[in-house]
């Protein structure tokens, strides 16, 4: 069996540069991009959550990436940004990118094996605000989506303990501001006196007018 020549193929596993810790700490240089996520790291408290800090060998996922979708290049092993990618590098079925083939053609050749998200085209149409409030004058010709829901009886009575997590709908009514002002009490009294005086004057006029005698 031939042995490798140490001159041609030297063993450099025990040789390190002095600036490697700086690159690893500041830029995550030399770390496996598929390493596991740190279970101690809290993105809401990044300074005091993980005891190893920036020297932790596991991945620290920032809070700004919590609502991102999965990187489509990472799914194929072609992402070159590593930890600095603005998309997620993890399998999360709820945050998969949309399947472009399905969105354009209405079907996907990968069927159940497709890793991307199949979004119903009807769900992209915005809901009709007038219909949600009770009535839409355009009816079936409306360009927006009419979603039939069952009204929550508890909400209609005044209060629903489930709030936004209720399985029934909670209608929202827009009340227009009429800019009404309440009159002061003195104006109300003056108005009532004026009405009473005008009524007394009309009664006096009727009494003073001569009445026709019937033959």
Curated annotation (Swiss-Prot):
It is found in: Nucleus. Keywords: Metal-binding, mRNA processing, Nucleus, Repeat, RNA-binding, Zinc, Zinc-finger. The keyword Nucleus applies. GO terms for molecular function: RNA binding; zinc ion binding. Its main location: nucleus. One of its GO terms (cellular component) is mRNA cleavage and polyadenylation specificity factor complex. Residues 192-215 are annotated as: Disordered. Belongs to the CPSF4/YTH1 family. This is mRNA 3'-end-processing protein YTH1. It comes from Candida albicans (strain SC5314 / ATCC MYA-2876).
